[in-house]
């Protein structure tokens, strides 16, 4: 399945919530009707089945993190094999993706932009260039911007935007040095309460 390259707001409207796919402190302005699905018949209210509700939740999370269907299923399988709560394990795996950590640290205005920075070899992990967006970041890893990339306007702009929003407690960032430390794995209470990971577990358990 190819990565979606269409309008970002359409995905947020499809899921009925801000997926933070657009750059900016406030990703979506008041003119965007999140409660209305895209398309000619978007205003029609459709009662979803139990399966439909579970599917929508899975799509919402998958699109938030910018992960393809096959990748997402593999993350779920890994989460199910890991000791502990499968749903929480899934969110932890998604949060430890390098592109997501780069976004959380504020080096990319969106996860898509962060993914591009990684792919274009602008990101270093513990002093070595890593260009794999799905690279798994571990506790205490140091993420930094490659020296020759530090003057990129989009990185400087992203850091400016990030300075205006609350930083995640599990990362520590030095904006001047353009580097940050992944201090610990995020706990469930650190992450969005709008995600109901149990619905995803129920979907894949069928």
Swiss-Prot record:
The UniProt record lists the keyword Iron-sulfur: no
Domain S4 RNA-binding: 96-156
GO function terms (MF aspect): rRNA binding; structural constituent of ribosome
PROSITE patterns: RIBOSOMAL_S4 (PS00632), S4 (PS50889)
InterPro entries: Ribosomal_uS4, Ribosomal_uS4_bac-type, Ribosomal_uS4_CS, Ribosomal_uS4_N, S4_RNA-bd, S4_RNA-bd_sf
GO biological process: ribosomal small subunit biogenesis; translation
Gene3D superfamilies: Ribosomal Protein S4 Delta 41, Chain A, domain 1, RNA-binding S4 domain
Annotated keywords: Ribonucleoprotein, Ribosomal protein, RNA-binding, rRNA-binding
Domain of life: Bacteria
Pfam name, any one: S4
Quaternary structure annotation from Swiss-Prot or TrEMBL: Part of the 30S ribosomal subunit. Contacts protein S5. The interaction surface between S4 and S5 is involved in control of translational fidelity.
Role played: One of the primary rRNA binding proteins, it binds directly to 16S rRNA where it nucleates assembly of the body of the 30S subunit. With S5 and S12 plays an important role in translational accuracy.
Record family assignment: Belongs to the universal ribosomal protein uS4 family.
Alphabetized PANTHER family for the sequence: 30S 40S RIBOSOMAL PROTEIN, SMALL RIBOSOMAL SUBUNIT PROTEIN US4M
Record's protein name: Small ribosomal subunit protein uS4
């Amino acid at each position: 399945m190819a990565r979606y390259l269409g309008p970002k707001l359409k995905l947020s409207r499809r899921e009925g919530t801000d997926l933070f796919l657009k750059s900016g402190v406030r990703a979506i302005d008041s003119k965007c009707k999140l409660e209305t699905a895209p398309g000619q018949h978007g205003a029609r209210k459709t009662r979803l089945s139990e399966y439909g509700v579970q599917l929508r939740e899975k799509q919402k999370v998958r699109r938030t993190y910018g992960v393809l269907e096959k990748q997402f299923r593999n993350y779920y399988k890994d989460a199910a094999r890991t000791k502990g709560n499968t749903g929480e394990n899934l969110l932890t795996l998604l949060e430890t993706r390098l592109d997501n950590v780069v976004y959380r640290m504020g080096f990319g205005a969106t996860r898509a932009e962060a993914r591009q920075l990684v792919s274009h070899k602008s990101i270093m992990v513990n002093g070595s260039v890593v260009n794999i967006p799905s690279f798994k970041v571990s506790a205490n890893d140091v993420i930094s911007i490659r020296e020759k990339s530090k003057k990129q306007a989009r990185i400087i702009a992203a850091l400016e935007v990030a300075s205006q929003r609350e930083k995640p407690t599990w990362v520590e960032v030095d904006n001047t040095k353009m580097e940050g430390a992944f201090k610990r794995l995020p706990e469930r209470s650190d992450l969005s309460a709008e995600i109901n990971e149990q619905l995803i577990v129920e979907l894949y358990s069928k």
